[in-house]
């Protein structure tokens, strides 16, 4: 009798676990996104973080430009405000050191992304407006610029760029 009870309990448990696993899985959603208005606040403690921060722009644009949304870039209104150490990445004299990031920014600018540098930060770093690339606009202040765009209904995104200490395979 004990043997039959054990087999019976095992079968019930196995059946219920199998059914539970089939019913409890994630699924893909298609959020009905509309045209985007976003202002990014770039303020980093290391200019090398600019390259990683640019992936935040890609992560907004690519899903919206791909299926099922197929939005044209002109329906994505994106402004990037630069006012930390990363300001050196958009100074023309530093092209060789930051050329990969510069070319990615130039590409995004060709899609309509606006890049604004804080005039106060530019002054603090000793840069005149002509020190920057043709796709850069110099605003009076990053803080007033961020407030302005938020008051116009833009969503504020402040990228957090961490140092990668583990590969995905190490922690998966």
Please name every model-derived segment:
Residues 71-90:
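Acidic helix-start/capping segments at beta-turn-to-alpha-helix junctions
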Residues 11-19:
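Hydrophobic h-region of N-terminal signal peptides that target proteins for export
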Residues 1-7:
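Bacterial N-terminal signal peptides that target proteins for export
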Residues 91-172:
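A cross-taxonomic marker for long C-terminal extensions/tails that follow the last structured domain
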Residues 52-71:
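Histidine-anchored nucleotide/phosphate-binding helix
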Residues 20-27:
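Cleaved targeting-peptide boundary
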Residues 31-45, 82-87:
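Acidic/histidine-rich, surface-exposed loop or edge segments in extracytoplasmic proteins
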Residues 38-41, 79-82, 114-117, 157-158:
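Structural recognition of the beta-strand scaffold that forms the well-ordered cores
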